[in-house]
Design a protein with these regions (language model features):
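Structured beta-strand-rich core segments of catalytic domains in phosphoester-bond hydrolases
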Residues: 30-53, 92, 96-170, 266-267
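Metal-dependent phosphoester-hydrolase catalytic domains
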Residues: 21-52, 199-203, 214-302
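Active-site-proximal beta-strand/loop segments in catalytic clefts of secreted hydrolases
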Residues: 69-72, 96-98, 118-122, 134-136, ...
């Protein structure tokens, strides 16, 4: 990961890379192995899933195993084996730098995964962005993009909702790839503010995970403000193998109304990020909170 932070030479190289990158005027949401392509809902106009009559199988409230991993676009050897292995023991996987080439597409189809992708851009004609994979279908998803102010390449965020077996509450899972190359924190603040606006209405259990690119104290302070506003908690590790840049961890999992049962950071060579694994169970008090009614999203004025 440190090789991405060689300052000026890296920025020049990144600007050159944009010649191969195409940025669409609209977001693309590619979901499940059928490869249906549609424009996702705006997170600012999302209809809260409480109002949808969707009866998908839910997650087990006693065991929700999450893996968060930046896949490095599959540039390193061994990622397919590692991803397939992790998928067998996790219920939800939040993936950043997913590169939907034939290798990843084939892996998703072979394993019959349920997945949703919010495309940030196309690299050499192939979609790249954030992807959330689960053993249950997302009952609703929305996404947005934020442009890197220096290299002008988008970063994507995806918000997905899942049923929880035996409960009216829905689990919100937000998957974010944080803006990276900035001289200050203004653009970073704007991305986090958009995420907050997109999910602050949800009063149920919540996971916010991703590659936050918190390589400075100022960036981490912005993230912790978001965490505090959402009444979320962070994970502490006795053995911290999380990927660090400039001495700061950049990948994080935050949660609410869930209780961590176990957690681990895996050491891998198949990406420049080490995956974070955590198993949650639904807190008892989260099961007793009444479902708040949210009006349907408006068609024109939102």
């Amino acid at each position: 990961m440190l090789n991405r932070f060689n300052s000026l030479p890296l920025i020049i190289a990144s600007l050159t890379l944009t010649a191969c990158v195409s940025v669409d005027s609209k977001r693309e949401d590619v979901s499940n192995a059928l490869h249906d392509v549609k424009e996702p809902e705006s997170c600012q106009a999302i209809t809260v899933v409480n109002n949808k009559d969707i009866h998908e199988q839910g997650l087990n409230p006693e065991n929700i195993a999450l893996l968060n991993w930046n896949l490095y676009k599959g540039n390193n050897d061994g990622w397919q084996k590692d991803l397939s292995s992790f998928a067998q023991s996790h219920d939800v996987m939040t993936i950043q730098e997913a590169y939907l080439d034939d290798k990843l597409s084939g892996l998703l189809q072979t394993n019959n995964f349920n997945w949703t992708m919010n495309t940030a851009f196309h690299l050499n004609g192939t979609a790249a962005g954030v992807m959330t994979v689960a053993n249950s279908k997302a009952i609703q998803s929305c996404g947005f993009q934020n442009i890197e102010p220096i290299i002008r390449v988008p970063k994507a965020t995806l918000v997905s909702y899942y049923n929880i077996d035996g409960h009216d509450r829905k689990l919100l899972v937000a998957n974010i790839h944080g803006i990276n190359f900035t001289l200050g924190v203004t653009a970073y603040q704007e991305q986090l503010a958009q995420l907050y606006d997109s999910i602050q209405h949800h009063d149920g259990p919540m996971i916010v995970a991703g590659d936050f690119n918190t390589w400075s104290d100022d960036r981490m302070a912005e993230v912790m403000q978001l965490v505090e506003k959402l009444s979320m908690s962070s994970l502490e590790y006795r053995v911290n193998n999380k990927t660090h840049v400039f001495g700061n961890a950049i990948d994080h999992v935050f949660y609410r109304q869930l209780q961590p049962v176990s957690k681990k950071v895996w050491q891998v060579s198949s990406s420049d990020h080490n995956p974070i694994s955590v198993t949650f169970k639904l807190k008892p008090e989260a099961r007793l909170i009444a479902v708040r009614e949210i009006p349907e999203a408006c068609a024109d004025s939102c």
